[in-house]
Amino acid sequence: MNRTVVSGAVESSFSLTDAVGTEALNMQRSSGINNNMRIPTSPMSFSSNSVNIPGSLVLDGSAASMQHLPQQQQQQLLQQQTGQGSVPMRENNYSHVDKKPRLEVKQEDMLQQQILQQLIQRQDPTGRNPQMQALLQQQRLRQHQQMLQSMSPSQRLQLQQQQQLRQQLQQQGTQQIPPNVRPYEVGVCARKLMMYLYHLQQRPAENCITYWRKFVAEYFSPRAKQRLCLSQYESAGHHALGMFPQAAPDMWQCDLCGTKSGKGFEATFDVLARLIEIKFASGIIDELLYLDHPRENRFPNGLMMLEYRKAVQETVHEQFRVVREGHLRIIFSQDLKILSWEFCARRHEELLLRRLIAPQVNQLLQVAQKCQSTISESGSEGVSQQDLQSNSNMVLGAGRQLAKFMELQSLNDLGYPKRYIRTLQISEVVKSMKDLMNFTGEQKIGPIEGLKRLLEQTVTVKLQKQKMQEMEQFGNNGAINGPVQAQMVLTSGTMNGSTGNNTNNHHQIVGRGAMSGPAEGQMVISSGTVSGATANNNSNNHNQIVGRGAMNGSAQAAAALTNYQSMLMRQNAMNNPNSNTGKQEGFSSQNPTPNSNQSPSSSSQQRHNLVTGGFPNSPQMQQQQRTMNGPTNILPQNHPHQLQSPHSHGNTPEQQMLHQLLQEMSENGGSVQQQQAFSGQSGSNSNAERNTTASTSNISGGGRAPSRNNSFKAASNNNLHFSEDISITDHDFSEDGFFNNNDIYGGL
């Protein structure tokens, strides 16, 4: 009886397989492509449903065939299958010993579940029918209860723990993913690429640009870029560098191979449709892609990367094929649109069809054999000149014909169609001129006039950026690089006071330092404004600039100082638009005498301000002024005097650096040459005078370069060419626009 049941089931199954075998084979491909991948049968019918891709690509043949069978045949098939599974065992069979309890599933339950699944698939392909989902959920719960009843208590506990752990992991995964990022499915990028290749092959025969524009809009993001790297080609010529071979290495770099040779092309979203259309219009019949094992990664921002370390791209032409091997990397957005397509080609091979080359080779062989037979019959001396000439012409003709056939007219050295590469080069030119096109369209002017205006605006913007960078560089106390390296410490101070109805403004800039050739020095520049008062009714403006130090062969340091002065001029002009332009500037190399109308306290205050800096009405500045001790002594002209370093504790690092330098000068016994400039005028008229004296000393080069400490000593000890340096400094500063501009002192 058992044998009869088994044989009957097998025979019926074989008969059923024979009856629907062809249909099942046909449905494997159609269901795998159309149902699972949801690729439309028509190439023109793109839809957004292609984003949702199920797990598998190919269905089983029996499952695919059962979906299209009548219900009665499905019931018979299920009964036969369950009959095969429930064959009774003989009495002498001991397989039931020491085995786990087996779950006995009734045939009715299996049939009911199968019917429910079929109804769900037919009525609602997306699985959102609530009634069917409720029935299916009840069926699953009943099966789960039956399974729990058949288990032992230990197995039940273990199953419950596994279910709890699975739920916790799922909750953690959903919490980590942002709400705007869709859940990640393994293999979704690879399946999206398969859909891309399918629609690439199922293009219309007329190769219209409308289809390719719709194709690009479906699979590429508006910010997409397609990059082709040819850096690993040894024989790549200049045509692989695009239209800008000199600027290409600095602007183009491959992220896959890490080289910066500039051999490659980049196409944006705007030209992708035209590029694909030209590719297939240049003789390419089909394009195939053979891929290795994929590597998928998901980034925290939702982007997904699909990488193939080994990818083979084959382009099929009418008479030959081009096989190209390389590295492929594709980056997808959150909505599965291609953001970046990068292909780094390593090498390529051009394969010709044997059936097309064989006739040409045979013809050449026949001509060569004929020449050989002619020579062997007549001998080397008996061959006439006419026969020899005819034979040679035949050989040359056959060889040229073969060479012409072997030469691929439409391809270049890289294996790409010449028209395709030319289009890539044109796209780079258009990309570089996109700003000009937009500018001419907005201004409604011609291309030549637009190019002139755009160039002027570009130059203006560059100059403004350069000025801002210079101001930031000097404002941030940056170091000046060159043969003379100087560190600038900037301090600014303002002290206001009044004893009467009139004001007396003094602008003093003191520079101390030592610069000699490649030596490294430090320059301390302090600028301050001191307001005093006299009993006179006249308003006297005194602007004094005192320079101390040694500058020997330091053209770059002088240029840096000039730039800094120009920067101060621009800053004060911007901050004080209503500046007083009535002030006059003057530069004198002689030592003036103090003004008789100026009080000693004012003169002492001027000398005191040479080493102090602060802000207007600042409590810190007042405290510094009270705590200063050891004022400088007034000595006769052309005699050095000793400057005592103040012991005030400034809150800024610039003031601390200045105090430290002065303290080192006093400790090392260094002396500096001091020249004071005072100017004044009595009467009822308002005058603006600016008297500046500068004293410099040369440091003889030789021996070791002066350091920060001994540079001040050298500056004070060597005073050999004092008058010559004064004239040189006078000429340098008189030509500078900083001292000829009256706007800088307007707001002080």
From Swiss-Prot:
The keyword Transcription applies. Residues 67-93, 138-163, 572-653, 667-712 are annotated as: Disordered. Coiled coil: none annotated. Residues 71-81, 588-606, 667-686 have a biased composition (Low complexity). GO terms for biological process: cell differentiation; embryo development ending in seed dormancy; gynoecium development; negative regulation of response to salt stress; plant ovule development; regulation of response to osmotic stress. Expressed in young flower meristems, ovules and the carpel margin meristem. GO terms for cellular component: nucleus. A motif (Nuclear localization signal) lies at residues 213-227. Disulfide bonds: none annotated. Residues 204-451 are annotated as: Dimerization. It comes from the Eukaryota. Disruption phenotype: No visible phenotype under normal growth conditions, but the double mutants seu and slk1 are short in stature, sterile and display strong disruptions of floral development and high frequency of female gametophyte disruption. Enhanced tolerance to salt and osmotic stress conditions. Keywords: Developmental protein, Differentiation, Flowering, Nucleus, Transcription, Transcription regulation. The keyword Transmembrane helix does not apply. Probable transcription regulator that functions in the development of the carpel margin meristem similarly to SEUSS (SEU). In association with SEU, supports organ development from meristematic regions by facilitating auxin response and thus organ initiation, and by sustaining meristematic potential through the maintenance of PHABULOSA expression. DNA-binding adapter subunit of the SEU-SLK1 transcriptional corepressor of abiotic stress (e.g. salt and osmotic stress) response genes. Belongs to the adn1/SEU family. PANTHER family: LIM DOMAIN-BINDING PROTEIN (PTHR10378). Forms corepressor complexes with LUH; LUH is the transcription repressor subunit and SLK1 the specific DNA-binding adapters. This is Probable transcriptional regulator SLK1. The lineage of its organism: Eukaryota, Viridiplantae, Streptophyta, Embryophyta, Tracheophyta.
